[in-house]
Structures are given as C-alpha cells and as structure tokens.
Design a protein with these regions (language model features):
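Conserved N-terminal phosphate-binding loop of PLP-dependent enzymes in the Aspartate aminotransferase
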Residues: 1-430
Length: 430
C-alpha cells in the first residue's frame, strides 16, 4: 500500500461513515480508483469482478460509453432545474416510456432521488388517497415479515421488526400490521392457505388499513427469499375484495433482475402503486420513481388540499432522466431478459456444488440472483477479505452470501466469479 492510499484510507476510517459500519470497530474498506465493465480497479493494482452490481444497480457495467455519452450530452444542455412550475423533455419522455413498460394501469409518475424516498412517496400517496375519500381512519399499512423497504422514517416502519435492521427505532416508529412471510417457495407447489392470515387480518382491520406493501416475488435485504407467484396474485385479489391498496416495491427487482422486466409480471398483476429505482439509471446517478393509477392520482387531487404533498429538491433531475433513458435504451437494445436467462442457467450449473455442503441450508437462484443461505451468521470482515483475495467483490450479510452480477458479464467472467465464489465459501466453511 503506497503512502497516498494509506493516508486516504486512514482519513476514511476516522471521518467517513459507511453504511451499517462502526467507526470504532470498522470493517476494512478497499479503495477503488476506477471501474470498467464488471471490474473494480483497486488502488493497489488488483482487479475485482463485481458480483454485486454495486448493490444491484449497475446492470450495464461501469464506465459504459453509451451511458457516459448520454449523461455528458445532457450536462452540456442543463444539469438541473427545479421541477416546481417548470418541466423538461427528458422527464416528459421518460414518464411515457415508464408508463408504456410497466404493468397496465399505472399512468402517473412521481420522480424522486432514492429508493427509500420512492417508498416514502408511495406510502404518503396511499394515506392521502384515503384522506381525500373522507376515510382518514385508513392510516395503517400491512406487510409481510422478512421484508425490507428502505432506511428513511416511514419505510422503516414497514420493514421486518427483527430482520429489517431498525430494531432500535421500534418504540418510535408507526405501528403497522405484519403477517408471516410467504411459506410457498417460488418453484414449489402452491398452497392457497398461505394467504389465510392476510384475509383474517383484512376481515378484522380493513377499516384501518390503507395499503399492503410488498416486494414482489423476491424479498431482498430482509432475507433474499423467493416466494410463489400465486401468493402475489392472491394478494391482489384480497386487496380488491377488502378495499386495500396494493403497493409493490420493485426497486431491487425491476428492470429484468428476476427474468421478467418487473417481478410482478410473474403473477400477472398490476399494483395500485409501484416503486422503482436502482437499475433505472444503472446506478450512474441516484434516481427513483413512484408510479400510480389515474384513480389514486386524481382522487388525491380532488380532495383536500388538492395536491399531493411532496416535492424533492432534485425531483426530475435532467441528468438522472438522461441516465434513465440510456439505461432503458440498453435494456431494449441488448435484449436483457434473454441475457438474464443465460446468466440464470449458468449460475444453476456452476453453483450447484454448494447445495451439497453440510452448512448450507439452501441454494436459491432466480434470474440473475444467486443466494446461499448458511446455518450460522457469517463473519463479514473475514469472508469479504477472502473474496477479495480470490479476485471478486461480494458483500455478504447475516446468514446470506449472494450475488447479483451486472447483465453485461460475459460467460467467462461469470465462470470466474462462480468458481471463486464456490472456492471461498467452501474454504470458509471448513
């Protein structure tokens, strides 16, 4: 390690707060100098194949020339302009593209600058919808356990109280209704009784519940679980039956990650409100969106105070809109759903040996997602360093070691990633 790198890392450790990391007992951070394709270039000269897509966002790889050019062109025109009282072509055209590609019935788009804020917006929309209808008592939310929806205030209240990483705030957050997580797995037999608890809750509390929020098909940071599409289909039906809005959080799953453009397509349903983010801009600029129906948007506008009460400073940022256009262009041009199917097949083949290890509870693969659930919680610092030593970047948590590689990864790069992934886990479990 040279002197410059050491100085930077020392200052970082002393003064820069990292996510879910203690400044007094820090886990090692690696200094990244540049990135290209699926590779992270470290300051010490090592290259790592990124198996995380930088927390599931960078689907088109790093330093993508098409993405760079789109952002650069927009930068020379207009980097930012307020969205109150003003608008611009990139935001207008993006709204049309999103409405055209998302499930039928979503006709209005609200832009924000992060996934957590997109969820905040979704929850506020649901509350204001019922307020406008003269039913303010419908002010609580229902959700499943093992869910995760972000780290801002209202989203924390609908994260799992135990696995959602927000236990210390339990006594100050809004109290919501939780049902057990879906028990029927994605590729196993469906049991309709999986939804009985939801129906019992709706029968008893429908007058209080504004909406049911859920991550469609894949529960992300709350457990990386894949559940049966018929659960989501049945949930849609129950929401209709009991007059509850259905909110889906597609921030991690949207734009092809599960093998469908949006995960709720596995169930053939349309939500009342949908959140998107992460891959929307391929991680190039922070950006997110909340889509809703004509009924929700217009009902809000017809009640008091006549407008939806939210307005981020960087709403509809032109650079972010340009990045989103470029990302969607590449999704369409590169036939990413076909590529994701190829990634899925290779993951199933090359990670199969992990399922035989005694300490592995389950190997789960869907689309471009692979999850190894272990019996015990991992030692993150040890395991992270082992992955780096083997030339790959993987960030485990809890009992889970998983990968979500960029869609642009080649077959040989994926083989290297899988080989190192298997070698490290096998070594770690010895």
């Amino acid at each position: 390690m040279n002197n410059k790198t050491k100085r930077l890392l020392d200052y970082d450790e002393k003064h820069v707060l990292h996510p879910y990391t203690s400044p007094t007992k820090p886990i090692r951070s690696y200094l990244v100098e540049s990135a290209q394709g699926v590779y992270l270039q470290l300051s010490d000269g090592r290259q790592l194949v990124d198996g995380m897509s930088s927390w599931w966002a960078v689907i088109h790889g790093y330093n993508n020339s098409y993405m760079n050019e789109a952002i650069t062109q927009q930068l020379h025109k207009m980097s930012h302009v307020m969205f109150g009282g003003l608008t611009h072509e990139p935001a207008i055209r993006l709204a049309k593209r999103l409405i055209d590609m998302t499930p039928k019935g979503l006709e209005h788009v609200f832009y924000s600058d992060s996934g957590s804020v997109a969820v905040e917006v979704a929850l506020k929309m649901a509350l204001q919808y019922w307020y406008s209808l003269g039913r303010p008592q419908k002010c609580k939310f229902a959700t499943v356990r093992s869910g995760y929806h972000g780290d801002t205030w209202h989203p924390m209240s609908v994260c799992d109280p135990v696995t959602g990483m927000h236990q210390i705030f339990t006594n100050t957050l809004s109290v919501q209704y939780f049902v057990n997580k879906p028990s029927c797995k994605f590729n196993k037999e469906w049991d309709p009784s999986d939804l009985d608890e939801v129906e019992r809750l709706f029968e008893e509390k429908q007058h209080e519940i504004a909406g049911f929020i859920i991550e469609p098909i894949v529960q992300g940071a709350g457990g990386m679980r894949f559940y049966h599409p018929k659960y989501l289909k049945g949930l849609r039906d129950l929401c209709d039956k009991y007059d509850v809005l259905l909110l889906v959080d597609e921030i991690a799953t949207g734009f092809g990650r599960t093998g469908k453009m949006f995960a709720c397509e596995w169930a053939g349903i349309s939500p009342d409100i949908m959140c998107i983010g992460k891959a929307l801009t391929s991680g190039y600029i922070t950006f997110a969106g909340t889509l809703t129906t004509h009924q929700v948007a217009h009902t809000i506008s017809e009640g008091y105070p006549g407008v939806f009460m939210h307005g981020p400073t960087f709403m509809g940022n032109p650079l972010a809109c340009a990045a989103a256009h470029a990302s969607i262009d590449l999704i369409e041009q590169n036939k990413v759903l076909l590529k994701v199917k190829q990634i899925e097949a290779q993951l199933k083949k090359e990670l199969a040996s992990l399922a035989t290890l005694e300490a592995v509870v389950e190997l789960r693969i869907l689309g471009a997602i692979a999850v190894v659930e272990l019996q015990d919680e991992v030692k993150m610092d040890l395991l992270q360093d082992l992955f780096v030593e083997h030339g790959i970047w993987i960030r485990p948590f809890g009992k889970l070691v998983y990968m979500m590689p960029p869609y642009v990864i080649t077959s040989s790069e994926l083989s290297f990633l899988c080989s190192a992934f298997c070698a490290v886990i096998t070594k770690y479990l010895r």
